[in-house]
A protein has these predicted regions:
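Protein kinase-like catalytic core scaffold
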Residues: 57-59, 99, 135, 168
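Broad gene-expression machinery/nucleic-acid interaction feature
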Residues: 55-58, 107, 155-159
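Short, surface-exposed helix-loop/turn micro-motifs enriched in polar/charged residues
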Residues: 70, 78, 100-102, 120, ...
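Catalytic beta-strand-to-alpha-helix segment of the class III nucleotidyl cyclase homology domain
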Residues: 115-183
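Activation segment
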Residues: 67-70, 112, 171
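Anionic group-transfer/hydrolysis microenvironments
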Residues: 64, 104, 165
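Juxtacatalytic helix/coil linker segments
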Residues: 1-87, 91-96
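Conserved helix-loop-beta segment at the catalytic/binding core of cyclic-nucleotide signaling proteins
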Residues: 86-119
């Protein structure tokens, strides 16, 4: 992983977020949720009240003590921090060919493998493991230096968990509102 290149990309995301601070208004913004993203599965071909089983390597990353940190540093610095941290993690997942399943607050879930991927267990686990290591390195070499340079002294600390195993893929919700999820 080229951390110098990652630094440039994340600095760009961060600078864009800084520029938008003055423009943010207290209005509801339209968002599109990550949906229908479990690799190899499509909501159109899944039925409610049914499921399929598959094997994936799952990576979950989240910030440690993020609520305490946010209370201490305030809204603007938390906003800027998230616009350095989340894009960095997503860039690294993309680099290691993972599939982002969900972004939940300051946590991100990504998958490797699955029956339809052609990726064997050993390689899926290796890719996820290398991704996790690069995430930890990126905090030290990219994200925290960008924040510190801008006067945000409280460094972001992350935890990364990786597991391989059987998951249940299902279409869950009601006709108007549903998602494809893996448990």
């Amino acid at each position: 992983m080229d951390f110098d290149e990652l630094y440039k990309k994340i600095l760009h995301h961060y600078e864009q977020a800084k520029k938008s601070l003055d423009k943010i208004e207290k209005t509801m913004l339209e968002h599109s949720a990550l949906s229908d993203v479990v690799p190899g599965y499509n909501a159109d071909f899944l039925e409610f009240e049914s499921y399929q089983e598959d094997n994936f390597t799952v990576l979950f990353v989240d910030m440690r003590k993020s609520t305490r940190r946010a209370k201490k540093i305030g809204g603007k610095k938390t906003f800027l921090s998230m616009h350095a941290y989340i894009p960095a993690m997503l860039e690294i997942i993309s680099y290691h060919q993972g599939k982002v399943i969900d972004i939940m607050g300051d946590g991100i879930m990504a998958f490797w493998g699955g029956k339809k991927s052609g990726l064997i267990k050993k390689n899926a686990v290796r890719k996820a493991g290398m991704c996790g290591l690069d995430m930890i390195k990126a905090m030290e070499k990219v994200v925290n230096p960008i924040l510190k340079k801008d006067g945000i002294e409280w460094e972001i600390d992350i935890g990364v968990g990786i597991a391989y195993g059987n998951v249940i893929v299902t279409k869950i919700g009601i006709e108007q509102f549903y998602d494809v999820k893996a448990f």
